[in-house]
Structures are given as C-alpha cells and as structure tokens.
C-alpha cells in the first residue's frame, strides 16, 4: 500500500485520467473529490461491497427465464 500525505487543496494522480483532491479536513473526517472518466466506477468501499454481493446473489439465483 502506498501511503501519501496531502494537504487541503493538494491532488494525487491515479494513472493519467483519475485525480483525487483533498477538499477539507474536519476532526477525523477527510473530504475528498474524485475526478474520473465516466467509464471508471467510483464508490465508497461499503457501497462497492454491497453492489458485489447483490451481483453474486442475483447470479446464483438461477436465471431460469
């Protein structure tokens, strides 16, 4: 895992097309902005895990149409 330190307003690049910018820090919360192409999905981890579990749940239900 790469660990970086950034200040408010600073940005990091992921590849050539994705940027992550620190927008603010309040207590133990950090606001970040992610700028990515439409074809790149960006989700919070808990939402991504729910999407994945729903996908695997629907694919294991059979598919008898």
UniProtKB/Swiss-Prot annotation:
> Where does this polypeptide localize?
Cytoplasm
Keywords from UniProt, A to Z, are:
Activator, Cytoplasm, Repressor, RNA-binding, Translation regulation
Matches recorded under Pfam families: CsrA (PF02599)
Q: Which residues form a coiled coil?
A: none
| Example of a GO biological process term | regulation of carbohydrate metabolic process
Q: Which domain of life is it from?
A: Bacteria
Q: What is its main location?
A: cytoplasm
Q: Recorded GO terms, molecular function?
A: mRNA 5'-UTR binding
Q: One GO CC term of this entry? A: cytosol
**HAMAP family (alphabetical):** CsrA (MF_00167)
Question: Which purpose does this protein serve, as stated in its record?
Answer: A key translational regulator that binds mRNA to regulate translation initiation and/or mRNA stability. Mediates global changes in gene expression, shifting from rapid growth to stress survival by linking envelope stress, the stringent response and the catabolite repression systems. Usually binds in the 5'-UTR; binding at or near the Shine-Dalgarno sequence prevents ribosome-binding, repressing translation, binding elsewhere in the 5'-UTR can activate translation and/or stabilize the mRNA. Its function is antagonized by small RNA(s).
How does the record describe its quaternary structure?
A: Homodimer; the beta-strands of each monomer intercalate to form a hydrophobic core, while the alpha-helices form wings that extend away from the core.
Task: Report the sequence similarity comment from the record.
Answer: Belongs to the CsrA/RsmA family.
Question: What name appears for this protein in its UniProt entry?
Answer: Translational regulator CsrA
Organism name? Shewanella loihica (strain ATCC BAA-1088 / PV-4)
The gene it comes from is csrA
């Amino acid at each position: 895992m790469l660990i970086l330190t950034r200040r408010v307003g600073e940005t990091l690049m992921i590849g050539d097309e994705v940027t992550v910018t620190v927008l603010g820090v309040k207590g133990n919360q950090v606001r970040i902005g992610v700028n990515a192409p439409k074809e790149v999905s960006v989700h919070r981890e808990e939402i991504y895990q729910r999407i994945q579990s729903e996908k695997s749940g629907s694919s294991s239900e059979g598919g008898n149409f």
